[in-house]
Amino acid sequence: MKQSEIKDLSAAELQEKLSQTKKVYADLKMAHAISPIANPLRIRSVRRTVARLATELTKRELQ
């Protein structure tokens, strides 16, 4: 998810997207721990998306 897409979301949508993305990240980590997944770089991508969403949410709360 690109930064411009994240900025277009409302605060409620950010919260929802963040929880969904965290669940995907946890599922990927679990799947990779059990047996290596086909594309392990997806874990990094999802982790960075979680960080982007959390950063934007915090930024909005501070304003």
From Swiss-Prot:
> Which keywords are on file for this protein?
Ribonucleoprotein, Ribosomal protein
Question: Which cellular components does GO assign to this protein?
Answer: ribonucleoprotein complex; ribosome
Tell me which InterPro entries the record gives: Ribosomal_uL29 (IPR001854), Ribosomal_uL29_CS (IPR018254), Ribosomal_uL29_sf (IPR036049)
The residues the entry assigns to the signal sequence are: none
Question: Would I find Iron-sulfur among this entry's keywords?
Answer: no
Q: Which cysteines are joined by disulfide bonds?
A: none
- Please provide, alphabetically and separated by semicolons, the GO molecular function terms listed in this UniProt record: structural constituent of ribosome
Alphabetical list of Pfam families matching this protein? Ribosomal_L29
Q: What GO biological process, any one, is recorded here?
A: translation
Q: Which domain of life is it from?
A: Bacteria
Q: Which family does it belong to?
A: Belongs to the universal ribosomal protein uL29 family.
- HAMAP family registered for this protein in UniProt: Ribosomal_uL29
- Name-wise, this protein is Large ribosomal subunit protein uL29
Q: Which organism is it from?
A: Flavobacterium johnsoniae (strain ATCC 17061 / DSM 2064 / JCM 8514 / BCRC 14874 / CCUG 350202 / NBRC 14942 / NCIMB 11054 / UW101)
